[in-house]
Amino acid sequence: LCRSRKDNAWAEANPDEVQQEYLISDRHTARGTKLRIHLMDGFHTQQLKVNTLDDPKRWWEVIDRTTGEVVPTDKWFFDEPTGEVEIETVPYHEYTVSFLAFLIWDPVHMYNFLTNDWKDTPHQLTYDVRQPKTQAYVKEKLRRWCEANPHIDVVRFTTFFHQFTLTFDDQKREKFVEWFGYSASVSPYILEKFEKWAGYKFRPEFIVDQGYHNTMFRVPSKEFRDFIEFQQQEVCALAKEMVDIVHSYGKEAMMFLGDHWIGTEPY
């Protein structure tokens, strides 16, 4: 059973609960006192779409990478029609923009589509089972499935909730892959819960990590370790609810270890 995809009708009807990922732009050097950065340069627009539903000033971050300082929100704005962020800059300093994007093509399905050279298969959208509407819908759908399939005694969860980081570039090549990556386990809903749990304000930099995306070769920050702990607690609690539903119908539950496993890793 796939819990986070294979239901495009639901995802299309609830675009606010499509899964999201934190992205970081390339570094750009300012030649003067103004700089415009096109957010989706280098990313595949069939996989990712800039989140324009939630407030950029709340959830995005512009950083002067020359000094390491965060650029105040009154010194930049998002020009939605062009997809660019305009920044008031110091000449010859480098800048990046960290921003939220919707995963409008499931990364695993995109990988299979490209690897197998599928032609006419519809792209599978994602949806975030952690969020209220989708969570209620998926639980009820699981109950209906169990009732409709009494002859099946073992249920394998192919996916739980969050895909490891698998991001494609504008040439449909793998731009960044991290089997233990948490970059695609985010949303304002989740991050507000994290802030209450952790007791401090979330920053996109905790995830994008100067563009290293907290690869296994990096020493994780305290904030990222906090985020991992929070995600594992939340994901495992919700996964248990799904397993309990399966058990309530007298069925055995097992999990496929491999893609949407973030928050359930056994090691």
Residue positions per predicted region:
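Glycan-processing catalytic domains of CAZymes
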Residues: 1-267
